[in-house]
């Protein structure tokens, strides 16, 4: 498959993720859309790496996946804290952390 196709797929996935972040109110769905955007960026890194014949993009994608794994742990802990306090998983309830 042509690397250009991977870049188009990456742009499509990133757009879907960005639309989900902007349009959805459920924290878990927003969180999944952010992860989709990160995976789209990883796909673009790997596609550019393959286009240029170097491993730099693959290394960046690997480290991005490590950071995303840490983000998942922290993000789910925050979501669970909000849900336990408010019994809701809405983005509007995220102001709980201010108090």
Curated annotation (Swiss-Prot):
* Pfam annotation, one family: Oxidored_q2
Q: Which residues cross the membrane?
A: 3-23, 28-48, 59-79
Reaction catalysed by this enzyme: a quinone + NADH + 5 H(+)(in) = a quinol + NAD(+) + 4 H(+)(out)
Membrane topology designation: Multi-pass membrane protein
Main location as per UniProt: membrane
Which EC number(s) does UniProt give?
7.1.1.-
Q: Which UniProt keywords apply?
A: Cell membrane, Membrane, NAD, Quinone, Translocase, Transmembrane, Transmembrane helix, Transport
Q: Name a GO CC annotation attached to this entry.
A: NADH dehydrogenase complex
User: At the top level of its lineage, which domain of life is listed?
Assistant: Bacteria
Instruction: Answer whether the UniProt record assigns the keyword Repressor to this protein.
Output: no
Question: GO biological process: any one?
Answer: ATP synthesis coupled electron transport
Q: Name one GO molecular function term.
A: NADH:ubiquinone reductase (non-electrogenic) activity
Which InterPro entries did the record assign? Answer: NADH_UbQ_OxRdtase_chain4L/K, NUOK/Mnh_C1-like
Protein function: NDH-1 shuttles electrons from NADH, via FMN and iron-sulfur (Fe-S) centers, to quinones in the respiratory chain. The immediate electron acceptor for the enzyme in this species is believed to be a menaquinone. Couples the redox reaction to proton translocation (for every two electrons transferred, four hydrogen ions are translocated across the cytoplasmic membrane), and thus conserves the redox energy in a proton gradient.
What is the official name of this protein in its record? NADH-quinone oxidoreductase subunit K
- Record organism: Mycobacterium sp. (strain KMS)
